[in-house]
Amino acid sequence: MAQKIIRTGSIEIANDKPMVVFGGMNVLESRDMAMQVCEEYVRVTEKLGIPYVFKASFDKANRSSVNSYRGPGLEEGMRIFEEIKRTFNVPLITDVHEPHQAAVVAEVCDIIQLPAFLSRQTDLVVAMAKTGAIINIKKAQFLAPQEMKHILTKCEEAGNDQLILCERGSSFGYNNLVVDMLGFGIMKQFEYPVLFDVTHALQMPGGRSDSAGGRRAQVLDLAKAGISQNLAGLFLEAHPDPDNAKCDGPCALRLDKLEPFLAQLKSLDELVKSFPIVETA
């Protein structure tokens, strides 16, 4: 089964290529923190030889509480992203929440992301597809992996085949998510690159009443399980002070653990992809 290769700059994203790290922070808390986080990701990924894309949100439009921090907004967010790109020369990915944002974001960011909660919103999907940008499609917590085919088709019929799929866990009762490892294989049958968002798979949605809880202590275990499935890359959030992060701190890796964390996953990715394919169907 041929696997499609999606290219951004010199980076090749494919299920049979070395893993790409889509890493950064959950939301742009400040310009200075974004620069700090990106600088550390660049240092670590360059040292380890891992292709890297910086990620962060300019607006968290789906927070549990109306009082929760959402981000700097579209205009200021794009200014911060532009500075990061100039300073570190890295590709950028961020999420889009409304159709009118798609073209604006695509002018700055190399990859635009369709949020999980919005992944069936046809007007948004089509607006994003028509930009021609690479789209990272998050699998909704309420969708089966085979249902992602419909979203891919919407994008393709709008003229865009620069697509990536991303697993971020499935609802399991209230305030809990689980990751079905068999789902990766189902999505890989569509031949597009598949990523694993380990950070958000550790969420406990609404687990702290007005915000999401999480299981940071298990991030390496779950990341290893995902990377063992021959994936195109890992989606990961880190923070210099997760306990005081403005969003999803309980799921975020401590920034000072990034190097040993990624070193283990790079070794695992190389090992898994060195094995010959065994047809078991």
Swiss-Prot record:
The keyword Cytoplasm applies. One of its GO terms (molecular function) is 3-deoxy-8-phosphooctulonate synthase activity. Its main location: cytoplasm. GO terms for cellular component: cytoplasm. One of its GO terms (biological process) is keto-3-deoxy-D-manno-octulosonic acid biosynthetic process. Pathway: Carbohydrate biosynthesis; 3-deoxy-D-manno-octulosonate biosynthesis; 3-deoxy-D-manno-octulosonate from D-ribulose 5-phosphate: step 2/3; Bacterial outer membrane biogenesis; lipopolysaccharide biosynthesis. Coiled coil: none annotated. Its EC number is 2.5.1.55. It is found in: Cytoplasm. Disulfide bonds: none annotated. Keywords: Cytoplasm, Lipopolysaccharide biosynthesis, Transferase. It holds the Pfam family DAHP_synth_1. InterPro entries: Aldolase_TIM, DAHP1/KDSA, KDO8P_synthase. It is an enzyme of class 2 (transferase). It catalyses: D-arabinose 5-phosphate + phosphoenolpyruvate + H2O = 3-deoxy-alpha-D-manno-2-octulosonate-8-phosphate + phosphate. Belongs to the KdsA family. This is 2-dehydro-3-deoxyphosphooctonate aldolase. It comes from Pseudomonas syringae pv. tomato (strain ATCC BAA-871 / DC3000). The gene is kdsA.
